[in-house]
Amino acid sequence: VFKHVLYIIKENRTYDQVMGDLPQGRGMKSLCIFGDSITPNQHQIAKDYLLLDNYYVSGKGSAEGHHWASAGMVTDYTEKSVRAWFRSYPHVLYDAMVYNKNGLIWNNALDHGKTVRIYGEACDFHFDGKKKYDWKTLFDKRKNNDLADFKYHSTSTISRIRPFLSQTFPGGDNETVSDQMRADDFIRELKETEANGGELPNLMVMALPNDHTAGTNPLFPTPRAMVADNDLALGRIVEAINNSKFAENTVIFVSEDDSQAGWDHISSYRTTGFVISPYNRLQKTVSTQYNQTSMLRTMEQILGLPPMNVIDATALPMFDCFSKTPDFSFKYKPRQNLIPLDEMNPIRAKLSGAALKFHDQSIKYAFQEIDKGDDDLLNKILWFSIKGKKRYPAKLAGEENEID
């Protein structure tokens, strides 16, 4: 049925943080900070296709999360060096000792004759030349159609994927770039492929990272604006696939890489996940327990690939997410953001109390760099940015030690 798989890896949210306001799922509305008004597309996709309310990540941070998401396991070395990272941070794969010897999902695809394209995953992003940009400057340049002088490239330590790594898609470890620019590039390439009579790769892996947020750093948008940016980008990508000639034989899988040890009333590992295609128009809640290895196993079966290790080999494929009867008539229409995407965090001079403290900590710990700072501290900052002085749900988060 399917010839093409698009696998989108987002950053660090729990189910209750995003979907907790949906009454048809097992959510706790009081824990929801990025609900329908901030993530209208994820909510609409859950209604139009299916809602997964029992889907889990396997790692608490991106160092483990991206390996679980792409390899279906983490190495013993990675487990034993969690939060130490003596040689380098595993997310961008500078340390060869973090690699699973059986490879990652793209190795599996290439080894079995499939075509692959990598959009921003497993790579590092670099500005060309001496000129660097901040988030607002780049956002305004895009709005004014003035990106001709914006030059950049991505690098990867994995020689196998370098020929398939997009150099026009901004690498996924840099939040200075709006996710709209990432969506722009993917949609441009999709339309060019279609116009030229080409074919999409069998496996496409995409990083869409800005729901990670940068805390309350004044050089970046507010947390809710960054999550809204990510949500709109996802909606636009789904629409583009849905309206292309590839719609009938393409399936989109969406997962967070990890939960950032965030709060959730079921589990701090529970997260958002989506399966999108004409065969997923169930319009119901699927409460079967699945996790990242289930998603990988499903992709492997769709592409005719063997499992990479014993963990994905024994994972339950996502059978309950698919119907035998497709709905080819439905065309997804993205919902527009209700939050201005360039709603910036306030500057220090306008702050006091907890807002001032969290402003300073957001800068000190550089939360715009994936998992640079303490997860639980960033969770507290995100909670405060939306909920104000309401008590932080520490007992429902993954961090045991409370930070005053």
Give the location of each predicted region.
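N-terminal pro-sequences and low-complexity stem/linker regions of secreted or lumenal proteins
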Residues: 1-404
